[in-house]
């Protein structure tokens, strides 16, 4: 799952599903933080044409939907913006945000539909109109032979990654 969309206010979003907390075997470090940085850079490069002013860059969000708790703190959501280390009240205001959505979370306030989405991701439980729409769309896509084949291959890869992650 990798989705890039923009809303009516020209805010751009890159959403990606993460089923495994990968480490780089050479450095023994987790890849998700650097992947976030890379995706922010890709969004900016795509959104700003050569010669355009930097202040034309729209707000961007890189959102990882994780089926694991990257920080092991139990939050439903971890949101990051750039802040001054010497004075945490100062925000850089570059309008670049990274969010890690933790489908296994237990702490914090989230919208009911987001919680339903987490339940759907974790257990394929349809318990709201929102998750019913998602489930219906997936069912429809499975009917298309080409999409169905790609979906089955993706599901097999996700299953393999989940097994490796356990």
Model-derived features with residue positions:
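Short, charged alpha-helical interaction segments and adjacent helix-coil junctions
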Residues: 13-18, 112-166
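Generic alpha-helical structural element
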Residues: 52, 106, 123-127
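Pocket-edge structural micro-motifs
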Residues: 64-67, 102-103, 142
